Regions:
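Short glycine/acidic-rich loop motifs that flank beta-strands on beta-rich extracellular proteins
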Residues: 73-76, 95-101, 127-134, 153-160, ...
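Bacterial N-terminal signal peptides that target proteins for export
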Residues: 6, 11-28
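Right-handed parallel beta-helix
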Residues: 111-259
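Extracellular beta-strand-rich solenoid/capping regions of secreted or surface-exposed proteins
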Residues: 50, 54, 70-87, 94-120, ...
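Acidic Gly/Asp/Thr-rich repetitive segments characteristic of extracellular carbohydrate-active
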Residues: 42-64, 76-78
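Extracellular beta-strand solenoid repeats
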Residues: 64, 72, 78, 87, ...
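C-terminal segment of classical bacterial N-terminal signal peptides
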Residues: 34-42
Length: 501
């Protein structure tokens, strides 16, 4: 009897084990079906990699490269939708793609409408590539690029494009991008939005030409939003990070060095935050905001440059309203920019507050101008041949093509500029701490006359370190320009005490 009971118990246990085995097998099979991994052998080259990416897309799977191995990439690797991840495990890719100016190449090109992929933990060596991006994607969402290294990039590192549809929720995090040079058009992280075509589309320097002729910027065709550029190290390139038509995005915690401009936000790049970045050795601006880019918040950045001889280190101009620069530390040494802080035409509502700024400028420590008109800027100067504080210092400036012009922007009054609560350490005894220039411009080339009154400007409560005559010439210099029967333009301050009383 006891033997029979024991036998029954054993049979019951065996049945339970078989049942559990079936359940476990079913779960594992389901997991493998959704998130299978395809391992790429060390011997694989471009054709093999492409085939495995295609298979991963079909199976909704990820791709694992082999740790410590090097793969040769001679042609663009097209990553289809459905690929869940590409994990490098420390692998290197020798990128030899050959694009052209009209047909760009990439090491990895994400398919349109890609969503839900992570690319991580590999190195792209791009010395032998041309007109290529390391990673590119157009009309993508929910994409993460993390812990990727790109070396000797001679065109683009990461390209995030809204050329054929909206872009949202793309992250570039803890990656290192080193460029081969700082040439115009060479950009480590390039985020751009296609613009509606008009009469200026396709012309050289179309953004500049459009704005100067019409005072307008082109409409973006798609949305490019929720981009997060965080904790990366970037060295070289014309811009370190370029936003064109990008909104509601973040550039945070990056170290960016050796660029013409460290960060550029143009073409209606609005409602973005630039925070806690280490910006080093720009030739021109460290943070540049232009062409209809509004409501951006630039705060808590640490900026040091020994190479700057271009425009303002922190600046907004050409229709870029209501931008705030606060709590930034700015230091210039050796070479000198035109200004350290600057606001230009059609950019009312600009605020500089709580910044600590130390260095030497070539025109003024802080500059505010309503209209870039050379003839107006030279008016009422007792026959002087230049206005040393103005953008149009000798009555002219150069357009991007290099051609000299005497008008370069400004379509009306400049209102509600705030420069308060900053700490300034100027180091040029021949220049003022603050220059404010209100200018006019005659009607010409189909453009109406412009009167650039400056209204409601507040320059007060700042701390200015140094001694007048030794470290700066005056606290405040103003200029109110006029031409024939036009003007003078006027300046109305709510407070012009400059320093804390």
């Amino acid at each position: 009897m006891m033997r029979r009971v024991a036998q029954m118990r054993a049979e019951k246990m065996i049945g339970m084990l078989f049942g559990m085995r079936k359940i476990i097998s079913s779960v594992v099979a389901g997991l493998l079906c959704f998130g299978a991994s395809i391992s790429v052998p060390a011997s694989a080259q471009a054709d093999d990699l492409q085939a495995m990416l295609k298979k991963a897309g079909q199976e909704n799977a990820g791709v694992d490269l082999m740790a410590g191995r090097t793969y040769v990439v001679a042609e663009t690797l097209n990553v289809p939708t459905g690929v869940r991840y590409i994990r490098g495990h420390g692998a290197h890719l020798d990128v030899r793609t050959k694009g052209t100016s009209s047909e760009l190449a990439s090491a990895f090109a994400l398919a349109k409408e890609t969503s839900g992929i992570e690319l991580s933990d590999f190195t792209l060596n791009m010395k032998n590539s041309s007109f290529s991006s390391g990673i590119s994607g157009d009309h993508i969402s929910n994409v993460t690029i993390r812990n990727v290294t790109m070396n000797d990039v001679n065109f683009r590192g990461v390209s995030i494009l809204a050329d054929h549809g909206d872009v949202s929720n793309v992250t570039v995090d803890r990656s290192t991008i080193t460029m081969a040079n700082e040439n115009d058009g060479v950009v480590p992280i390039f985020v751009s939005t296609y613009r509606v075509k008009d009469d200026y589309t396709g012309k050289g320097a179309e953004v500049w030409e459009r704005y100067v002729a019409t005072g307008k910027t082109a409409d973006p065709m798609f949305k490019n939003t929720d981009i997060k550029i965080t904790d990366n190290t970037i060295d070289g390139g014309y811009y370190g990070i370029e936003f064109s038509g990008v909104t509601s995005s973040h550039i945070t915690g990056n170290t960016i060095r050796n660029n013409t401009r460290n960060i550029s936000m143009q073409d209606r790049s609005s409602n973005n935050t630039v925070e806690n970045n280490q910006l080093r050795d720009s030739i021109s601006s460290s943070v540049h905001i232009a062409y209809g880019s509004e409501h951006n918040d630039v705060k808590g950045n640490n900026i040091v440059t020994r190479r700057a001889y271009g425009q303002g280190i922190l600046q907004a101009y050409q229709g870029s309203k209501n931008n705030t620069f606060s709590g930034n530390s700015v230091t210039t040494r050796d070479k000198h920019p035109s200004w350290l802080l600057y606001v230009g035409p059609d950019s009312g509502g600009t605020t500089f507050t709580g910044n600590t700024v130390d260095g030497t400028a070539n025109r003024a420590f802080v500059g505010v101008e309503s209209v870039w008109d050379g003839d107006s800027s030279l008016s009422h100067l007792n026959d002087a041949k230049d206005n040393p504080h103005s953008y149009m210092v000798q009555g002219e400036s150069k357009k991007p093509s290099g051609e000299t012009v005497r008008y370069a922007g400004g379509n009306g009054p400049l209102e509600n500029i705030t420069i308060t609560g900053n700490t300034f350490t100027p180091r040029n005894k021949t220049l003022p701490v603050v220059y404010v220039g209100a200018e006019v411009s005659k009607a010409q080339n189909g453009r109406q006359e412009v009167r650039g009154d400056i209204k409601g400007i507040n320059v007060s409560g700042n701390t200015v370190k140094g001694v007048k005559g030794n470290d700066y010439s005056e606290l405040l210099v103003t200029h109110e320009g006029s031409l024939d029967k036009l003007g003078p333009a006027t300046i109305s301050f709510t407070d012009k005490s400059v320093v804390a009383q």
